[in-house]
Amino acid sequence: MDVGFSRTTVQTLSRSHCKNIKQKISQWEGRANGISNPEKWCPKDFGVRYNCHQEIRLKKNPIAERKSKNLDVTSRENVGLDINENTKSHDQSENENKKHEYDDTHFFKNESESNWVCSRVKEIESCKEDVLDPETSLPPGNFYTSQILWKKIEALPPDKLLNLALEHCDSSEKELNFRVLDSSYGITKSLENIYSEPEGQECGPSINPLPKPRRTFRYLSESGVTPYKERNCDKKYCENNSCAQSSLASSQEPEPKKYGGKIRGRSKRKSFEFEDIQHFRNRNSQTIREELGRNSGSALYYTQSEDNIYEDIIYPTKENPYEDIPVQPLPMWRSPSAWKLPPAKSAFKAPKLPPKPQFLHRKTMEVKNSQAYLRSKLTKDTTLPVTLTEWKLFRAGEVANTKRKNLPRLVLKIDDIFESKRGKKKVKLHSYTGKELPPTKGETSGNESDAEYLPKNRHKRLAQLQPSSKRNPHYQTLERDLIELQEQQLFELFVVVSLQKKPSGISYIPQVIQQFPGKDDHGYKQSKDMEERLKVIPKFCFPDSKDWMPTSELKSETFSFVLTGEDGSRWFGYCKKLLPVGKGKRLPEVYCMVSRLGCFNLFSKILDEVEKRREMSPALVYPFMRSVMEAPFPAPGRTITVKSYLPGAGDESIELCRPLDSRLEHVDFKCLFKCLSVCHLIRVCASLLLERRVIFVANSLSTLSKCGHAVVATLYPFTWQHTYIPVLPASMIDIVCSPTPFLIGILSCSLPQLQDLPIEEVLIVDLCADKFLQEVSDEDEILPPKLQAALMQILEERNEILTQEQNFSQDVTLNSLVSEAFVRFFVELVGHYSLNMTVTERGERVFQREPFRKSHTSRSVRHFLDLFMETQMFAGFIQDRELRKSGVKGLFEIRAIQYLETIPESEPSGMNRILRSLGSKMKFLQKK
């Protein structure tokens, strides 16, 4: 677009931008001698493109029409944009473009054309108030903008448009220099030409280079000096609009950097066209500005760095950068290291973004604390606690202060008793080097107390008594059993067993008189295994069938038995013995439910409902049992409802609740402590830990079954893997002669037959008299003395502890007390097993036996582990942990983690420390 400039203005502008003395002299000589070359009168291109059709449009458009459109052009010009050629003008001939193209290195052409230039300038000055057609004079579109954008903002008033532009200029990195010119000069000119020659070069001939892309927005010149006239205009404008500018400026956005007192030039600036256009469009919308508030602006962030555009990033700071990151809680069996925990809030400083938290990337804990371990090819187990060093780091943080805060009072009481009896001796970590460590000569040396010295003959005796039974590859744990039961039914079989006379008429034999599901039921197919079980179930329902005679009075009795399959699976039989409805002397009947779920109380309630219906009619049992079998399998702590019809009462709903703690579902410790003293109970448990043979004798089926289940429950987290028959029928008494380990209960009437059998190395316990009928005589020396003393103290003071704890919590029961006491006992023995789990290169977990055993500082514990680690219970326990792909979440693992948190760093102590220091000094002297 052609804009008129007076001769004085052109000379002033050209004089202010002369690069050297030679140009100034040439300019002065031109003024003094007169201009002969008209091309030299052409004004220099100061960043403003001229329309080649200006002359034609000035003749066609009337003055009135141009005045009416002056407002729109002014609004576009005041934005501070470089107005380029219209895209329509590029379609004209090449001659017209060359005719109006100006040289970038000269201000004037040949002197022969001076008259034409003067007339041309006068013509422009006469039409200085004229305005072009707004549609034609719009800035052309480029890579970043288009004419459509300018058409959308064309209708805005000039004041509002300029204020919006100034608002953006105040919030950008470098303030744009808007100039308010007189109405006669309604357009701004850039004081720099990108086609001008570099400094220090001679003005050469005119060159017409290819057009380069120009920025839409105009920035300050490199010198940073504003002409005097324009500074006055800016000052006047700022005085009139100071309030508006102060309200629009944002205090949060950074101020432009200055380098050596000068604002960085255009050549050193990064491109902001896209950001500025986006920001400018957002400023036009009042709704967007209200929603975004003070932080409204471009969605892109501005860089302040001159060297690297990714160096400093302005980002709105937060009090906690991790507050928007949902972090899932870690599993209970492993805790994160301190280096994985997010740092304090004070560590985050704006404007730099903090790095991505490491705990979002890593899913395992691997802290290696020795060079030997680093050289090994095996890695630590990732599903359980790894090293003591990691636990020290973890306790050093905030968790250390609340280590004992959330533990129940009962657990704290038990821990205090064990710590007082045991002393300061705890396990120490042995770094695994990839080889089995051989027994060292000084392993048994140390500062052990005299009470812990073990006679050699005793250790030899225990080793000889240890049975060498074949391990069962099908190891069953309570957790695995419960997983397998999720898809099972509540029970497998229900039978009613009665006594029938033998053909000889002298004695009675048990027979099944009612069965559900029946053999003829549709859809029921009896397996071969079930047929074998049906043959022996009547014998377990009446283990003393030959001693029964018809009677008119009989006290109801409940008991249970266990059937062990060849694969190690167990079936629980829940029985209730009673007299059938009738008059006179009658033979008793037994209701028996066979299930894979160990929950005595739940099935006792079902058997009570069966008894109620069978008294009315045996036909009512089938509908009820079918509704129970179709009921869903209850989860721990859940209740299921069974609906059935009862004549005279109508429809009934029976709620069956399964206890939350599945370990103690079929356990009654009251009966166990009623029959056995604490001293005898500890000796029985010690014999079972070494997998010896144990026989219980009692005159009641319920006593035998309850005591047998309770003793087995004390072995948690280990599971008895061998023969387990709480009630053994008299006809099967020969089983006690088996050389394999077993736990068997027999009635007192079968005791004479038992004494006649050749039995060796067996512990026979009379539950009614609380005494040992036969023993090996070393049962009280099996367990470590200090741990055994702590366990005995807790069990002997159980009533006092329960009385104290029940004042604070009603959930404390005898079962929970006994369970926590034995769990703590085993945590002291094997609670550090996870520290000796390694993972091979193939991803297989491997247990390191020798480092595990030697990690105990107590010699008595190490001697016990020598024997206990050879049992099938321990082997199955480790095998189950090795094969599991996910961590175990039982009570034992929870208490083991809490125990590992209290382990101090392993340091040499006592005589060992002195001997090691002397050894190092001797080696040092030998080197000299």
UniProtKB/Swiss-Prot annotation:
- List the InterPro entries hit by this protein, alphabetically: cDENN_dom (IPR001194), dDENN_dom (IPR005112), DENN_C (IPR043153), DENN_domain_containing_2 (IPR051942), Tripartite_DENN (IPR037516), uDENN_dom (IPR005113)
Q: Which GO terms describe its cellular component?
A: nucleoplasm
What keywords is this UniProt entry annotated with?
Guanine-nucleotide releasing factor, Phosphoprotein
Q: Which GO terms describe its molecular function?
A: guanyl-nucleotide exchange factor activity
Locate the Phosphoserine modifications and list their residues.
271
Q: Identify the domain of life.
A: Eukaryota
Chain ranges of the dDENN domain: 798-888
Q: Record keywords: Isomerase included?
A: no
Domain uDENN: residue ranges: 492-641
Gene3D superfamilies linked to this entry = 3.30.450.200, 3.40.50.11500
Which segments show compositional bias classed as Basic and acidic residues?
85-105
Q: Where is the cDENN domain?
A: 663-796
SMART domains per record: dDENN, DENN, uDENN
Region of interest (Disordered), residue spans: 67-105, 245-266, 428-456
Role description: Guanine nucleotide exchange factor (GEF) which may activate RAB9A and RAB9B. Promotes the exchange of GDP to GTP, converting inactive GDP-bound Rab proteins into their active GTP-bound form.
Protein name (database record): DENN domain-containing protein 2C
Gene name in the database record? DENND2C
